[in-house]
Structure formats: C-alpha cells, structure tokens
Amino acid sequence: MTKPKIMILPDKYPCSISSILISSESMIATFNHKNILQFNHNHLDNHQRLLNNIFDEIHWTPKNLLDATQQFLQHLNIPEDIYTIYILVS
C-alpha cells in the first residue's frame, strides 16, 4: 500500500482548509464547506461534526492538517492509497 500524494497549496501555517480536491486515474472529487453541509444533510450520522470542523478549524502545523485530512478520508471511506490530494488553504 502506498501513501497518497498530498499537496498543500499554498504551504503556509497556521491555515484553514478552503477546499480539498481528490484525484485518481478514474475520478476527481472536490469538497468544500458547501459540499460537506449537503453531504451531512443527506447522510445524517454521529460523525457529521468531524466533516464540518475540518473546514472550520485552524490547523497550526502540517501534521495537524494531514491528520485532519486522513480522518476526513477515512470517514468517507475513501481509500487513500490510490489518490493525489490537493488541499487548498487560506
């Protein structure tokens, strides 16, 4: 199993996530605050705070940001071994 290629653009800290773009050979998916609110409305569960918070929180270090992104992928059952992940921050 290979680790996903993760790029943070621009590379600055502290930051908050503006959007996440996930790509593979067969698909591209983007997530932002509006997408997540719609996802939560359609899939109400105990973990919806995690999805909202990833875009609301300030991430102080690259490790915090990568940990939050990996939790996000796990929550959505996205296999992280075949993807390139672009994290756009502000």
Curated annotation (Swiss-Prot):
GO terms for cellular component: host cell cytoplasm. The keyword Magnesium does not apply. Keywords: Host cytoplasm, Viral RNA replication. It is found in: Host cytoplasm. Disulfide bonds: none annotated. It comes from the Viruses. The keyword Transcription does not apply. Mediates the regulatory switch from transcription to RNA replication. Acts late in infection by inhibiting viral transcription and up-regulating RNA replication. Inhibition of transcription by protein M2-2 requires phosphorylation of the phosphoprotein. Belongs to the orthopneumovirus M2-2 protein family. This is Protein M2-2. It comes from Human respiratory syncytial virus B (strain B1).
